[in-house]
């Protein structure tokens, strides 16, 4: 939104994308006085060139475009940082990974670059500029974060007359389920875990490695001592509910134009799995109120009906 040199009073407006991406900026967190985070803003022009201008067909072209990001007008160590989808390197541009490897391994040092990362850069060069950022913004939605909750106008297009009004009731249904699962975890977690929040956050170690030894080590570190085998299974189910509840918000489920598409159907499958696992913990009916909200999510294709009919179909698979 705006920037200023640390210690100065006057702000500079950068709201139209004119921020200098070659340095870091310090953002002071208003809700937590004294705390801050150092931020980097990627070079949009070079990033777009990598993604859309076929730079990845030639490693030399790639390096030369990076060199274009250097300016003699800057009197500080310049950071050239870009942000592109990983699928650009091979999926969208065949052998793009080879062009990247050629550039990184053989050419960038010859061009005068030093390969680094954000952490190392900050250790060497402290942020001396302050930044205020735009609230609720994203790279793929001009309306903030509307793409993940509303019929904001952002979609993949290709179908004149279609709308994405289904996003809001879908979001409301998932939020309802998420809130129910948060309450469930907070209540039940105390029965199984030394520290429920730590167990939840570090469950990723099991997700990444589901071997017997990995699961055993995780349980020894985070489970309350003396749990029976049955209780351990319940505890693992509780953690899996939390994982599935996060998967419900997978971004591609909101990206496309139609609720019956495979991406959105997949996040409804995650929701179905959440409700399936939760049945052993709850006596209350979650499916009825969940489907009641989803019936407002109308498909653009008449034969698919609403989100409720899609969820019911998913639940039967």
Which residues are covered by each model-predicted region?
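Short secondary-structure transition/capping segments
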Residues: 4-7
